């Protein structure tokens, strides 16, 4: 019998500190950096974001999202036999956030590892978990996107520091006799490493190079719109479906203009676009599972709906997953 995988539970968590554009602008003004609510909303669609407290880590955020996803799936933590965490902001250089989170869940033994594809991380992680379940290597996988991007922001650069937020989202992916994950399409092109990166690295007890995020916004925008369309069309072709079969488009929540452009290229009405970037900002690998969980819990996404998940991020990486919820 053919083995498939499907999502059986979703969960998410945002740190309680919500920062509006006006509040962020006031904090930046003290440092001599000028911005405003109008400037941010016009260019990004972002109105607020959440920042974690200094002592809160990606594993802390991921733990809360994981607990909610496990509960939604009707499982216990001990039922999980695979943990994959997509993150670019780990608690430490090593071991992985997944191993730390596994211990916090009170379980041991199952494989646990991190996956780093920046803002594409969740679609990469979901694809890997799907493949492992189909191969028989796992039956109940916990797939998490968790980030504390506030730690790597340059608050003297108004073009980047206003974009990002912290948070976590998670899904439980279980073995199934009927298809849930219908198709996926992943890509990368390393020649674009420099347009979105944190170039610093640790050497001899010191950080060499900048430990803060740097981005060429125009280059990212130009690349993102094209590759998101191509990845979406590739997954549809693999699944034998059409754009009109998509019930909900859940893209990486980076910028409202990119999201609207992608929907337009796929000839999807904006009513089919799940948007959380206005309240969450760009939470990198956490953005897609955060948006998915919010859409499920609000009643928008229902069982049987066809969902297109899309991510694009540093690397340059991009990809899409088409699934039946």
UniProtKB/Swiss-Prot annotation:
It is an enzyme of class 2 (transferase). GO terms for molecular function: 3-oxoacyl-[acyl-carrier-protein] synthase activity; beta-ketoacyl-acyl-carrier-protein synthase III activity. Residues 253-257 are annotated as: ACP-binding. Belongs to the thiolase-like superfamily. FabH family. Keywords: Acyltransferase, Cytoplasm, Fatty acid biosynthesis, Fatty acid metabolism, Lipid biosynthesis, Lipid metabolism, Multifunctional enzyme, Transferase. It comes from Polaromonas naphthalenivorans (strain CJ2). Pathway: Lipid metabolism; fatty acid biosynthesis. The keyword Lipid metabolism applies. GO terms for biological process: fatty acid biosynthetic process; secondary metabolite biosynthetic process. It catalyses: malonyl-[ACP] + acetyl-CoA + H(+) = 3-oxobutanoyl-[ACP] + CO2 + CoA. One of its GO terms (cellular component) is cytoplasm. It is found in: Cytoplasm. HAMAP family: FabH. The active site is at residues 119, 252, 282. Homodimer. Its EC number is 2.3.1.180. Pfam families: ACP_syn_III (PF08545), ACP_syn_III_C (PF08541). NCBIfam families: fabH (TIGR00747), PRK09352.1 (NF006829). The last Arg residue of the ACP-binding site is essential for the weak association between ACP/AcpP and FabH. This is Beta-ketoacyl-[acyl-carrier-protein] synthase III. Catalyzes the condensation reaction of fatty acid synthesis by the addition to an acyl acceptor of two carbons from malonyl-ACP. Catalyzes the first condensation reaction which initiates fatty acid synthesis and may therefore play a role in governing the total rate of fatty acid production. Possesses both acetoacetyl-ACP synthase and acetyl transacylase activities. Its substrate specificity determines the biosynthesis of branched-chain and/or straight-chain of fatty acids. The keyword Zinc does not apply.
């Amino acid at each position: 019998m053919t083995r498939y995988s499907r999502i059986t539970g979703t969960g998410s968590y945002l740190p309680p500190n919500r920062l509006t554009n006006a509040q962020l602008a006031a904090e930046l003004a003290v440092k001599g950096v000028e911005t405003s609510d109008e400037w941010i909303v016009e260019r990004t669609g972002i109105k607020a974001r959440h920042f974690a407290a200094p002592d809160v880590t990606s594993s802390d955020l991921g733990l809360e999202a994981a607990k909610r996803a496990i509960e939604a799936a009707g499982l216990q933590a001990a039922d999980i036999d695979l943990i994959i965490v997509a993150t670019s902001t780990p608690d430490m250089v090593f071991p992985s956030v997944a191993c730390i989170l596994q211990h916090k869940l009170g379980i041991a033994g199952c494989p646990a590892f991190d996956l780093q594809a920046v803002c594409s991380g969740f679609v990469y992680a979901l694809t890997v978990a799907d493949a492992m379940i189909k191969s028989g290597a796992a039956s109940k996988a916990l797939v998490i996107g968790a980030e504390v991007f506030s730690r790597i922001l340059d608050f003297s650069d108004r073009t980047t520091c206003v974009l990002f937020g912290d948070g976590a989202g998670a899904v439980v992916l279980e073995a199934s006799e009927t298809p849930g994950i219908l198709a996926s399409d992943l890509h990368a092109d390393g020649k674009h490493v420099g347009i979105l990166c944190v170039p610093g690295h640790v050497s001899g007890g010191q950080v060499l190079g900048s430990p803060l995020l740097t981005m060429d916004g125009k280059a990212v925008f130009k690349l993102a719109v094209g590759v998101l369309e191509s990845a979406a069309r590739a997954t549809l072709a693999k699944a034998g479906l059409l754009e009109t079969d998509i019930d909900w488009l859940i893209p990486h929540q980076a910028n409202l203009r990119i999201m609207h452009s992608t929907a337009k290229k796929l000839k999807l009405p904006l009513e089919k676009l799940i948007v959380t970037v206005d309240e969450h900002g760009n939470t990198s690998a956490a953005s897609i599972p955060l948006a998915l969980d919010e859409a499920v819990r609000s009643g928008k996404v229902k069982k049987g709906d066809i969902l297109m998940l899309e991510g694009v991020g540093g690397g340059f990486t991009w990809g899409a997953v088409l699934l039946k919820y």
